[in-house]
Amino acid sequence: MFGISFSELLLVGLVALLVLGPERLPGAARTAGLWIGRLKRSFNAIKQEVEREIGADEIRRQLHNEHIISLEDEARKMFAQNQHPETTYEPVSPQPASVQPDAANTGHNTLGPAEPAAPKPALSLEKTAKPVDADTPVPTPPVHDSSLPPRAP
């Protein structure tokens, strides 16, 4: 891994035995092994996270490219339809509230005159209107208390 041969490793072990002594050498070797294991696990976790992010970025890039390609294909179809008005255009994906040209007007991209909208019925909270009696008192709004904050308009 680090390019250390067996003889170099044996030399490091001999120096550690002389410096630490025979009582503390097994504990030091165990601690060094634990630290090396933690470093390896941390390195592998970071490497996996980077690979996962690269994979996610690649997937995002691929989806974006596919979306752009589909938009380009749709634009080509629309351009081809403008060049050849006798062919009908079918969109790649359904679009809500899209205006479809009718068969008589496929040669032009202009909208005709707008038709007047149908009159809207009067809005009411009740389903049926009740006739107002002359004896029925007209409801009055409650008097505003001056100790309360003003009402919003």
Curated annotation (Swiss-Prot):
Gene Ontology terms, MF aspect: protein transmembrane transporter activity
Source superkingdom: Bacteria
Region (Disordered): 78-153
Keyword Protein transport carried by entry: yes
Membrane-crossing residue ranges in chain numbering: 1-21
Membrane topology term: Single-pass membrane protein
Keywords tagged on the record: Cell inner membrane, Cell membrane, Membrane, Protein transport, Translocation, Transmembrane, Transmembrane helix, Transport
Subcellular localization: Cell inner membrane
Nucleotide-binding in keyword set: no
An example Gene Ontology CC term for this record: TAT protein transport complex
Major subcellular site: membrane
Record-annotated disulphide pairs: none
Any single biological process term in GO: protein transport by the Tat complex
Gene3D superfamilies, alphabetized: 1.20.5.3310
Function description: Part of the twin-arginine translocation (Tat) system that transports large folded proteins containing a characteristic twin-arginine motif in their signal peptide across membranes. Together with TatC, TatB is part of a receptor directly interacting with Tat signal peptides. TatB may form an oligomeric binding site that transiently accommodates folded Tat precursor proteins before their translocation.
Membership in a protein family: Belongs to the TatB family.
Self-association state and partner proteins as the record states: The Tat system comprises two distinct complexes: a TatABC complex, containing multiple copies of TatA, TatB and TatC subunits, and a separate TatA complex, containing only TatA subunits. Substrates initially bind to the TatABC complex, which probably triggers association of the separate TatA complex to form the active translocon.
Protein name: Sec-independent protein translocase protein TatB
Record organism: Pseudomonas savastanoi pv. phaseolicola (strain 1448A / Race 6)
